[in-house]
Amino acid sequence: MKFKSLLVVALAAAVPALACAKKPKTPAAPAAAEAAPVVEEEEPTITEECVVNVSLFHESVKNKMYADAYEPWWDVYQHCPNANKSIYSDGAKIVEALYGATTDAAEKARLANLAIEMQDKRIKYFGNDPKYPKSYILGEKGLAYIDFFGDTKLKEARECLRQSAEGMGPASKIMVLVKLVDVSYALYKENPNTLAEQFIADYEIASSLLNEQATNSNNKNAEIAGKQKDYVDNIESVLSKPIEDV
């Protein structure tokens, strides 16, 4: 169906966003498109119900009643994920317990994905926390990849652990540093010709930070850090052997 030229021009002027099947031979220069205004996402409202549910699931977790904790925790996690950091510290315990308790493959997969998603959401709402910032949370995410996905997500785990070590420095969680070396070594064994330098770099940062922790007289975990440094040093020593002998 054809439109008269005057009608086409009128429609084009009134609704410039419409796409035309046949353009006029001498179209008017289009107006410069204005950038869409940036709309900041509103923080979820922390309702009285959320506050009550935080108290309920936290008390259940303290008593290791993880099944009872799940329902109030899930409600808070969905509706007011910015209410309290315990949503994530307690949530990790809840998800881990339920994951271990179920034999249903679909439920295990759901909980595994939830464990990772939870850390991303924690970064979104609490990534600027002075004690447990984004770098710390990335370490927790890397450990979650290992715990819930085993050797199927080693690259993702390593990336998170490496970023955590770089960001936290001497304040890094000991297990993050140890697992960084473990995971990097596992990846190296799969591709010894291409990932040797990556493994050495990961080992060096982990060993150096563990050494700082082990030699810090004010660190209550200095002895543990020293033992773990010996462990990662032993892993690094295998590079002097042929990969088939390891």
Which residues fall in each region the model found?
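Bacterial Sec-dependent N-terminal signal peptides
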Residues: 1-32, 92
